[in-house]
Regions:
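Short coil/turn segments at secondary-structure boundaries
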Residues: 21, 68-69, 369-372, 419-422
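Short, conserved active-site loops that position catalytic residues or coordinate cofactors/metal ions
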Residues: 33, 66-67, 71
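Structured non-transmembrane domains adjacent to transmembrane bundles in polytopic membrane proteins
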Residues: 46-65, 74-165, 383-586, 596, ...
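Disorder-to-helix initiation segments
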Residues: 38-42, 49, 238
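A short N-terminal beta->alpha junction/helix N-cap motif
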Residues: 12-13, 40-44, 78
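Membrane-embedded transmembrane helical bundles of large multi-pass transporters/channels
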Residues: 1-37, 100, 131-386, 518-731
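Short beta-strand segments
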Residues: 70-71, 126, 253
Length: 731
C-alpha cells in the first residue's frame, strides 16, 4: 500500500485524466442502462413450478396472462348487444396486434360465466404477449394507452402481471430521480458540517458519483450477457453514494490529520494510502464478500444485486484509493481553503473517549443491557411470514393496483393468478374418467373457487360447465392441464395460497403431475431459498472471520464481530416485521401491509447490512490495533481508537443512512423497507454496537482480544496483512 501511495503522490495528474475519461464514457452509457434491465426475476427458474410453467407454455401456449382487461358496460349487462359487439371487436382487434400470441374473452369463449363479474356489468379479456419481459413492456407501452379508456359502449381498464411489472419499473425510475434529488443536497450540507470546508466536503460526494457512474457502465455490460433486475439501480445509487462517501471520509480525515501533524503533502498522501487506504481496501473486501453470497441464489432479483453490489464496492474503493489521493496530492493544503474552522486533532478528552471509558468501567451491565435491547427489538422476527411481491407493492393510487383491486372485488375467482396443474404422459381422451375425477377432487379443496379441465369445469366437486370445444384447450396429444382458480379471498402470494398448493400436491392421482403458477412459485421459491440460506450465511461468516484474522491476528475479535453483527441484524429484521408485516406504520409510510415480508428483501438486507457492519468494524478495530501496538494497553487502545474513529464513523453512518432514508420516498413498498431497514441497521451498528457493545466486550476480553493459538499465530506472522507508514514502522 505504501508503494501505491508513493506512486499516486508522484503521478496524480495522469490518474485524474484517466478518471475523467472513464467518467465521460460512463456518462454516455448511464442513461441507457435502465432500458436493458428487467422488472421480474423474483422466482426460482430451477424450481418445479417454473419448469412446469415453461412446459405448459411450450405444449399449450398458456401462461399467466400478461394483460387482463376489465370491460364494463356503461349500462345494463355485458350480454347486451352493444357491450357484446364492443367486447368481440376488442378481442378481435387485440388478437391482430403484433406480439400478441393468445387472446381469450368472455365473449369469444361463448359467455364463459367465470369471466363475468358477479353483477354481470363487467367481463374479462385475457391476453398473452411474446418475448422477454422487456419486449412485453415495450408492447404494453403501445397497447395500454390504445385499449384502455372509455368509448360509447364500454369502459376498459388494464392490469395483469406484465402490466403490473411495467408500472413497477416506471415507478422505480421515477423514485430514483426523486431519491437523488432529496439525498444529494442533504449529503453536501452534512459533509460541509463534518469537514468545515467546501472543497473537502465536495471530494467524498464526487467519489460517490464516480462510483455510481462506473457501476452503471459495468451493469450495462453484464446486462448484455444475462438478465439483470432493474431494482439493482437502487443499490447502485444507494451504495455508490454511501460507500464512496464512507470510504472518502476516512481517507480525507487521515490526510488532514497527517497535514496537521506537519507532514509534507507527498508524505501525507503516502501515509494516508498506507493506513486509511489499507483499512478501506479490507473493508471493501468484507462488503464485497457479503454481497457475493447473493450469487448462491438462483433468483435473478438477488443475483442482480450482486452484479451491481460487487462492482459498486470495487468502484467506491478504487475511487477512494486512487482518484481521491490523486486529488489530495494536487490540492495539498488547498483542501482547507475557505475552511470555516480547522478541526483539532483528536485527543483524550473527546466525547467518544469519555463514552468508551464510561462503558469500560461497567462492561458487564452495558453488554447485558445492550444485548437485551437488541433481542427485544428482534423478537417480532420470530413471527415473520415470508412472501413474494404482487400488485400491492404499488401505491394505492397506481392504475394497475386500482384495477387489480377491482378484479378482486367484483369477480368470483382470481383468473389472473390461477394455479396450473400439468399431467404429462396422459391421453385426455382415453383417460377422461381419471381426468374428471381428479378435477372434481381439486375443486373440493378449501380456497379453490373453480377448476377448468379437459373434462369440463367444476365447482365444489360438481360439474359447472360440461366439456365442449373450449375444453379442448386443456388437452394435447400426451398431456393435459388443469386450471385451478383460487377464491378471490385467497391472495396468490399468501399463506392461504401456500396451503392450497400443499393440498394440491398431496392429492392422490392416477397419474404424475406438477404444479405451476404464482402460488407454487412462492412455495418453491421459499423452499429453494431456505436450502441455500445456511450456505450463504456460512460463506459470509467464514470470509469475514478469515479477513479479520488476516488483519488482526486474533480469534476472538472476528468471532465477536460476527456474533454482534448477527445480533444487530436480528434487531433490524424484528423492527421490519413490526413495521411492514404488521403494518404499524403503514399510514405514516403510505404502504399497504400484506401480512408478509418479501423473502428476497430479507436475504438481500442481510447480505448488505452484514457487509456494511463489517465496514465500520474494520475502521474501528484498525485504529484500536494501531493504538494497542503502540501502547500495549488494551483499555487505552479501545478508548483512543473509538475517539479517533467515533466522530467519522458516526458521520459516515449518518451520511449513508441519509442515502437509504431517501428511498423511503419510493412508491414501491419493498423499496421503502429496503431503505428504512438498511438505514436502521447502519445507525444502530454505528451507535449502539460500536459505541457500547464493542468497547464493553473488548474490555471483558482484555488482552485475549489479540490472542490466537500458536499455529495460527505463526500463520498470521507469515501471511497476515501488515501496513507500514511512510517511515516504515508497522502500525
Amino acid at each position: 500500500m505504501e508503494r501505491l501511495g508513493r506512486f499516486i503522490a508522484n503521478h496524480p495528474r495522469p490518474l485524474l485524466v484517466a478518471t475523467l475519461v472513464f467518467v465521460a464514457l460512463g456518462g454516455l452509457v448511464a442513461p441507457t442502462v435502465s432500458s436493458h434491465l428487467s422488472s421480474g426475476g423474483f422466482d426460482d427458474p430451477t424450481s418445479e413450478s417454473a419448469l412446469a410453467g415453461t412446459r405448459i407454455e411450450r405444449i399449450f401456449g398458456v401462461n399467466d396472462p400478461d394483460m387482463v382487461l376489465i370491460v364494463e358496460a356503461h349500462s345494463g349487462s355485458v350480454d347486451d348487444d352493444a357491450a357484446r359487439r364492443a367486447g368481440l371487436a376488442l378481442t378481435k382487434s387485440l388478437s391482430a396486434e403484433h406480439g400478441v400470441v393468445r387472446v381469450e374473452s368472455y365473449w369469444s369463449l361463448g359467455g364463459a360465466i367465470p369471466l363475468r363479474s358477479r353483477d354481470g356489468s363487467k367481463a374479462l379479456v385475457l391476453a398473452n404477449l411474446e418475448g422477454t419481459q422487456n419486449d412485453k413492456h415495450e408492447l404494453l407501452d403501445e397497447l395500454v394507452p390504445r385499449y384502455s379508456g372509455t368509448n360509447d359502449d364500454v369502459r376498459v381498464a388494464v392490469t395483469g402481471f406484465s402490466e403490473i411489472y411495467r408500472q413497477v419499473t416506471a415507478q422505480v425510475e421515477e423514485d430514483l430521480v426523486r431519491a437523488e434529488l432529496v439525498a444529494i443536497p442533504i449529503l453536501l450540507i452534512l459533509l460541509l458540517f463534518v469537514f468545515r470546508s467546501p472543497i473537502a466536503a465536495s471530494l467524498p460526494l464526487g467519489v460517490g458519483l464516480v462510483a455510481v457512474i462506473g457501476t452503471l457502465l459495468v451493469l450495462r455490460a453484464i446486462a448484455a450477457l444475462t438478465e439483470v433486475s432493474i431494482f439493482a439501480l437502487n443499490l447502485t445509487t444507494g451504495m455508490g453514494l454511501g460507500l464512496g462517501i464512507d470510504y472518502s471520509l476516512f481517507v480525507v480525515s487521515r490526510f488532514r490529520e497527517e497535514l496537521a501533524a506537519g507532514a509534507a503533502v507527498p508524505d501525507a498522501v503516502t501515509t494516508t494510502v498506507a493506513t486509511a487506504g489499507r483499512t478501506v481496501l479490507f473493508s471493501a473486501i468484507a462488503v464485497a464478500a457479503s454481497l457475493s453470497a447473493l450469487l448462491l441464489f438462483p433468483i435473478v432479483f438477488l443475483r442482480s444485486f450482486a452484479y451491481a453490489g460487487i462492482p459498486v464496492v470495487a468502484m467506491a474503493c478504487l475511487g477512494a484509493l486512487v482518484t481521491l489521493p490523486a486529488l489530495l496530492a494536487v490540492l495539498g493544503h488547498g483542501i482547507d481553503k475557505w475552511s470555516v474552522r480547522r478541526t483539532a486533532p483528536a485527543g483524550e478528552t473527546g466525547a467518544w473517549y469519555r463514552i468508551a471509558r464510561w462503558v469500560m468501567r461497567r462492561p458487564l451491565p452495558v453488554a447485558a443491557a445492550g444485548t437485551v435491547v437488541l433481542l427485544l427489538l428482534g423478537a417480532p422476527f420470530l413471527g415473520v411470514e415470508l412472501g413474494l411481491p404482487d400488485d400491492r407493492v404499488l401505491p394505492p393510487g397506481a392504475p394497475g393496483r386500482a384495477v387489480t383491486d377491482e378484479l378482486r372485488r367484483d369477480f368470483a375467482g382470481n383468473e389472473a393468478a390461477a394455479m396450473l396443474v400439468l399431467a404429462e404422459g396422459v391421453d385426455p381422451a382415453s383417460s377422461r374418467p381419471q381426468v374428471r375425477g381428479f378435477a372434481q377432487r381439486l375443486s373440493r379443496l378449501d380456497g379453490v373457487a373453480r377448476v377448468d379441465s379437459a373434462a369440463g369445469s367444476f365447482i365444489g366437486g360438481e360439474l359447472f360447465f360440461a366439456a365442449d370445444v373450449i375444453s379442448e384447450r386443456f388437452a394435447a396429444e400426451d398431456a393435459t392441464y388443469f386450471s385451478v382458480v383460487l377464491d378471490p379471498k385467497v391472495e396468490a402470494q399468501s399463506l392461504e395460497a401456500e396451503d392450497v398448493v400443499a393440498d394440491v400436491r398431496s392429492l392422490d392421482a392416477p397419474f404424475a403431475f406438477e404444479v405451476a403458477g404464482p402460488s407454487a412459485d412462492l412455495v418453491d421459491g421459499k423452499s429453494g431459498a431456505f436450502a441455500r440460506i445456511p450456505v450463504a450465511v456460512a460463506w459470509i461468516a467464514v470470509v469475514t472471520f478469515v479477513t479479520l484474522f488476516l488483519l488482526f491476528g486474533s480469534i476472538l475479535v472476528p468471532l465477536k464481530a460476527v456474533v454482534l453483527n448477527l445480533l444487530s441484524l436480528t434487531a433490524t429484521f424484528g423492527a421490519m416485521v413490526w413495521v411492514f408485516q404488521d403494518g404499524n406504520l403503514s399510514g405514516l409510510l403510505d404502504f399497504t401491509p400484506t401480512g408478509t415480508i418479501v423473502l428476497s428483501n430479507i436475504i438481500l438486507m442481510f447480505c448488505i447490512a452484514f457487509g456494511l457492519s463489517m465496514d465500520y468494524e474494520v475502521f474501528l478495530l484498525s485504529r484500536v490495533k494501531e493504538e494497542y501496538d503502540a501502547t500495549g494497553d488494551n483499555e487505552l487502545a479501545v478508548a483512543r481508537g473509538l475517539d479517533r474513529t467515533g466522530r467519522i464513523v458516526t458521520a459516515a453512518a449518518a451520511l449513508i443512512a441519509i442515502v437509504f432514508v431517501a428511498m423511503i420516498s419510493s412508491g414501491i413498498s419493498f423499496i421503502k423497507m429496503f431503505g428504512l431497514g438498511l438505514a436502521l441497521a447502519v445507525v444502530m451498528d454505528a451507535t449502539l454496537v460500536r459505541g457500547a457493545l464493542v468497547p464493553a466486550f473488548m474490555k471483558l476480553m482484555g488482552p485475549a482480544n489479540w490472542w490466537a493459538p500458536a499455529p495460527l499465530r505463526r500463520f498470521h506472522d507469515r501471511f497476515g496483512i501488515r501496513e507500514a507508514t511512510a517511515g516504515g514502522t508497522r502500525t
